[in-house]
Amino acid sequence: NPVLRGIILTSKESSLWINLTNISEDLASAFAEWVSDPQMRKIVMDLKNQRKLLREYGYKLDGAIEDPSLSSYMCGYIAAANRRLFAERIEDLAEKYLWIPQQEFSALVFPEEAPSLFEMPGEENLRYFTQVSRVIHELARILHFEMQEQCQLKIYEDIELPLLYVLADMEQAGIAVSDTLLNELNDTFSSRASMAEEQA
C-alpha cells in the first residue's frame, strides 16, 4: 500500500512542502480544514486514488476542479500498457500536450544523472516533485481548453469529475454481503427451479 509522507502544494508563484510524518497539531488542523474545503479550488492528479489515500490518514479531500488524469482520458489519451506508472504517465502527457521531450523529469532538475528517488537528499527531492507539480498545473490548464474545444467540458464538470468522489468512497467502503439475504435468494431460486421441473 502507498505511504503518505507529505504533500506538496504549488501555486503559480510558489510551492509549499508539508511533511505529514512530523506535523504539528496546529498545521495538521489548518491543512485538514483547507484540504476538505470545497470552496478552496484544487488541481489533483489521480483524484480518486488521492482521496482514498488522504482519507486513510484522516483527511478528507474536496474541492478538486481539475484532474489531468481524467481530463486527458476525456480528450482521448489512453496510457500505454507499459507506461502506467505515475511518473511515466506524467512524462507522456507532458510530451503530448506541453511539447516537452520525453525524458525523466529529474533531467529538468539535475545537471548530471539523477540519483534514485530513494537516495535523493531532501532538498533535491523537493525540487524534483516541485517540477512535476508545475507540469501537472500546466497540464490541467491545457486540457481544460482541449475539453472545451471538444465539447466535453460540461460532461467532465457535471458528471465525470463528481463521479470520481463517488467511486473513491465506494471502493473504500467496500461491499457488504448479507448471509441472510443470500440464503433467501438461494431458497427462492431453488423453489422456482423445483416448480419449473415439476411443470416440465
Where are these regions (language model features)?
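Conserved RNase H-like, two-metal-ion catalytic cores of nucleic-acid enzymes
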Residues: 1-96, 174, 190
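Mixed-charge, glycine-rich, non-catalytic linkers/tails in nucleic-acid processing enzymes
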Residues: 62, 103-200
